[in-house]
Every structure is written in C-alpha cells, then in structure tokens.
Amino acid sequence: MSGLFETLGRRALFTFDAEQAHGLSITGLKTGIVTCRTPEDPALSVKVAGLKFPNPLGMAAGYDKNAEVPDALLKLGFGFAEVGTLTPRPQSGNPRPRIFRLVDDKAVINRLGFNNEGHEAAFKRLSRRAGKSGIVGVNIGANKDAEDRIADYVAGIRRFYQLARYFTVNISSPNTPGLRNLQAREALHELLSRVLEARDEEGNMCTLKRPVFLKIAPDLTDEELDDIAAEADAQKLDGIIVSNTTLSRSGLKNPENSNETGGLSGAPLFERSTVVLARMRERVGPDMPLIGVGGIDSAETALAKIKAGADLVQLYTGLIYRGPGLPGEILRGLSTAIKHEGVSSIAELRDRDTKEWAARKLIS
C-alpha cells in the first residue's frame, strides 16, 4: 500500500497546494474508503501512564487539528490518535502559503500558527464519539492574543476532561511568538502547577485521572533539558513528548523552500529529535514515560526511537510521503523485530541504545 501510494497517490496529491492536499486527505478519511487495518499483535501492546495502548504507534497532533477523523485514523492501525492543537477560541493562524514541501528531503516546513476551529467545535465532534473504544488524546494550546496563556491551557483541561484519554500541553510550536518561552524553568513551574491543579480538581469530581504530557522542542540546550526534567519530576508529570518541529535547517539536501520561516518536520528531524529523546531519558530515569516524535517513516526509524528511550512513538510527515499503508507497514516490521531480537514484547527493547544516541553531537 505504501509503495502504491508513493507511485500513484502521492503524485496526484502533490499536484495540489500542500494545505489543499491535507484537506483532501481528511475528506478521504471521512468517507471511510481509506482503511488499512492491521491485525493486532499482543507483543506490541504497551502500558503507559495507566493506559493500555494496543501498539506503540500514534498519530501526532497537527494532522487532525479539529477532531474530525480520530476514529478513521485508528482504523489505519494507529494505537492512538492525538487531535489538535486546540485553542479556546477559533483562530485562522498565519497567512498562506504556510506549508512547504521539501520533497527531496521528505520533509515539510510549516508556520501554521495553531489554526483551528476552537474548543467548542472540537468538543461537539468528540462528544459524538463518547463511549467508543480507542485512545484519543487532546493537544491543547493558547490563543495567539491571549492575555494569560496559561489560563488557555487550564481551559483546555477543563473543557475536554471527560472526552480526552490524555492531554498534551503544547508549548513548543515555533509559530506562536513567545510560546517556547514557557519552557523556561520559572514559567514552566507556573504552567505545570496550574494545569495539573486543574487536572486534579476535574479528576476528583469524576474519579478519573487523565495523564498530562508535555511536548517540548528539539532545539533546547542541555541546561534547558536539565530544567525541564527537574520540573517534570518535581511536579510528577505523566510524561514528555520529544519533540516538536525544529528551527534548524542542518543536513538538508535541497535548498528549495529551506529559507521559509517555520518548523521543519520529517526525515531531517529524525537525528536531532532522537538525540534529544535519549538525553531526556538519561535525565528522567527509567520510570517517566517518553513519547518519541520526529522523522519516523519506517519500522526501522520507529524501532530506533524505542531503543533510544521511547515508550510510545508518533508520526505525521511520514504519512504525507508514504501514505495510509505506512502504519500497518511499521507495525508488521516491529512485530518482526520482536521475534528477531528474541524478546516477548516491544517494551523490552526500550533503552537498548540510549547511551549511544545521547552521546551523538548535534549540528545547529
């Protein structure tokens, strides 16, 4: 399926503007004609933050921004799907064009700016799937013009508490001015304190404790990673997602579109994000869940993330270039890897290569 898509489907979709092509793919999933379900392998099941995932492969936030197709994504074989980023009020994001393909590099640069229809539109859609099986997380953000950005994150926790299986606090998008400043220790302390307080208050009212993950940038210094790890431990955060898109342009094969402002995702992000993942694993120790994101486009890259320290992995850009058959292809490859490695579950392969990845040097 992936090979056929690369030959025919991608050629057709790539005749459209990147944002139009994205809209067409959402429409295709809504029709239900795109399904590539892969038989479940119990050896791929992973328990993370109190949730049992049927497999470790998830759809990253940014694709289904408005919670339109989470169940269709699960039918592609994903073990979980993350919708958003959602802000309290609708916002249009940055002016178009704002998505740029770097085809030779199997990469994308975007400067979307949290364009979404807001909490209420997504709430209505997610309410319609209440009671359905499948893990759907909600990625929450802040409106660009918010006077109190932390209050926007708190609002997201409260609005979606009954519907989200987990939350991701996104403070690492490079496309909202000043947002990444929330990763600094003092600001992060206030953010996590208020968000987790809201989570605990909501949880106490319904006896459900929803995990909260923090999504960080791949462009952080070792000292900044130290601060985030320390704060995550002190606040008893449920996990960290490593990582969002990068501002770095190192290693690109083709300069076309590389000077565009925005975050770079796809294959060139793999090395940087995996190194930062491993370094974060060394800092937080074996118990805190980590979700690896960035450059996953095969079973080999997914397995490398797990061996570098990830409990779960997510992809997005790989799907653009490889098509809807990619999740199944990755899961089959991971099942084969488990047998080849002589272990009984994918979780046993975590951290096999953490030290080697953490020691690699990064080019800015």
Swiss-Prot record:
One of its GO terms (molecular function) is dihydroorotate dehydrogenase (quinone) activity. It catalyses: (S)-dihydroorotate + a quinone = orotate + a quinol. One of its GO terms (biological process) is 'de novo' pyrimidine nucleobase biosynthetic process. It is a peripheral membrane protein. Pathway: Pyrimidine metabolism; UMP biosynthesis via de novo pathway; orotate from (S)-dihydroorotate (quinone route): step 1/1. Keywords: Cell membrane, Flavoprotein, FMN, Membrane, Oxidoreductase, Pyrimidine biosynthesis. It is an enzyme of class 1 (oxidoreductase). The active site is at S173. Its main location: membrane. It holds the Pfam family DHO_dh. InterPro entries: Aldolase_TIM, DHO_dehydrogenase, Dihydroorotate_DH_2, Dihydroorotate_DH_cat, Dihydroorotate_DH_CS. Its EC number is 1.3.5.2. It comes from the Bacteria. Binds 1 FMN per subunit. Substrate binds at K65, N110, R111, L112, G113, F114, N170, N175, N244, T245. One of its GO terms (cellular component) is cytoplasm. FMN binds at A61, G62, Y63, D64, K65, T85, N139, N170, K215, S243, G266, G295, Y316, T317. CDD domains: DHOD_2_like. It is found in: Cell membrane. Its cofactor is FMN. HAMAP family: DHO_dh_type2. Monomer. PANTHER family: DIHYDROOROTATE DEHYDROGENASE (QUINONE), MITOCHONDRIAL, DIHYDROOROTATE DEHYDROGENASE (QUINONE), MITOCHONDRIAL-RELATED. Belongs to the dihydroorotate dehydrogenase family. Type 2 subfamily. This is Dihydroorotate dehydrogenase (quinone). It comes from Brucella canis (strain ATCC 23365 / NCTC 10854 / RM-666).
